[in-house]
Curated annotation (Swiss-Prot):
It comes from the Bacteria. The keyword Nucleotide-binding applies. Pfam families: DHQ_synthase (PF01761), DHQS_C (PF24621). CDD domains: DHQ-like. Zn(2+) binds at residues 178, 242, 256. It comes from Staphylococcus aureus (strain bovine RF122 / ET3-1). Its EC number is 4.2.3.4. It is an enzyme of class 4 (lyase). Belongs to the sugar phosphate cyclases superfamily. Dehydroquinate synthase family. This is 3-dehydroquinate synthase.
């Protein structure tokens, strides 16, 4: 399946299929040099899938740490210095092969190297179906996640679904959070559909039918980012679950999707408090437990610590913390939330696990 962005200019294709890695070769001859930034996990398990690619002249492999630990100033400088030592030109390609963190990091390298070189995304996880599309790239700061970055469109996104076959269950859970988020954004019917399909851990772990929901998620994100590339309006909706989720992820060092799921429950609690929305919190908690999400850490949440991270969220303005909230299905808002409401919501969330 081939999708295409529909910006006024500078569009890029998104290939989503089994065996899609073959499309990388169609781009390599266009560049003076190419650097595959490949995460250590993918290199360990899939190195042979790239044999044909390394038969091309001037293609280099750069192995980087997997996950968020690659998104540091130190790794950024080390990678840039290595690439620059090859006397690169602007007709160079940075090719990100790995999960969402790899794409974020490699994209920031591409955006800043010589003030911008070519960039190809080759996502290898479910989570990266979200992050590889839309052009957000960046690294982390001691103050929080993704606070240093840019908007930088790739030349292409090549999503080979064969990579998903060997994902450990923890990564399936983490990736499913973004798939589920897209269903929530699409409304009550889409949410019921995905919940009925992925009823429990066994079905989710099998990945049966996941291709369809990934494709739908990408289409949902495309519709939003083409309408609002620089996140001035509706693109903020894609941050559903992320204001609280990023704080939990960064402080408790849990997988991104696990934290986003906690953030999704949290925003339902906040919406109930602000709008009397009557979301069934127990339903969502029980659903996540059926899927196998480890939620025990919720009892250890410390609001004051998390609130300091929430204050650094990129959606905020001078009025304070902004959250994406589902007032009702089909009615999504970006709302300022006061500290007391946020604190009470955190306390209420913890009561479900005592």
């Amino acid at each position: 399946m081939k999708l295409q962005t529909t910006y006024p200019s500078n569009n890029y294709p998104i290939y989503v299929e089994h065996g899609a890695i073959k499309y990388i070769g169609t781009y390599l001859n266009q560049f003076d040099q190419s650097f595959l930034l490949i995460d250590e996990y993918v290199n360990q398990y899939f190195a042979n899938k790239f044999d044909d690619i390394f038969s091309y002249e001037n293609v280099h492999k750069v192995i980087i740490p997997a996950g968020e630990k690659t998104k540091t100033f130190e790794q950024y400088q080390e990678t840039l210095e290595y690439i620059l030592s090859h006397h690169v030109t602007r007709n160079t390609a940075i090719i990100a092969v790995g999960g969402g963190a790899t794409g974020d990091f490699a994209g920031f390298v591409a955006a800043t190297l010589l003030r911008g070189v070519h960039f190809i995304q080759v996502p290898t996880t479910i989570l990266a179906h979200d992050s590889s599309v839309g052009g957000k790239v960046g690294i982390n700061s001691k103050q929080g996640k993704n606070l240093i970055g840019a908007f930088y469109r790739p030349t292409a996104v090549i999503y080979d679904l064969d990579f998903l076959k060997t994902l450990p269950f923890e990564q399936i859970l983490s990736g499913y959070a973004e798939v589920y988020k897209h269903a929530l954004l699409n409304g009550e019917s889409a949410t019921q559909d995905i919940e009925q399909h992925f009823k429990d851990r066994e079905i989710l772990q099998s990945l049966n039918g996941m291709d369809k929901y990934i494709a739908k998620g990408i289409e949902t994100k495309l519709d939003i980012v083409v309408a609002d590339e620089k996140e001035q309006g509706v693109r903020k909706f894609l941050n559903l679950g992320h204001t609280f989720g990023h704080a939990v992820e960064y402080y408790h060092k849990i997988p991104h999707g696990h934290a986003v799921m906690v953030g999704i429950i949290y925003q339902f609690i906040v919406a109930n408090a602000l709008f009397d929305s009557k979301h069934d919190i127990n339903h969502y908690i029980q659903y996540l437990l059926q899927l196998g999400y480890p939620l025990d850490m919720i009892t250890d949440l410390d609001f004051e610590t998390l609130y300091q991270y929430m204050l650094s969220d990129k959606k905020n303005d001078k009025q304070g913390v902004q959250m994406v909230l589902i007032r009702q299905f089909g009615d999504i808002v970006v709302q300022h939330v006061d500290q007391l409401t946020l604190q009470h919501a955190c306390e209420q969330l913890k009561t479900y696990f005592k």
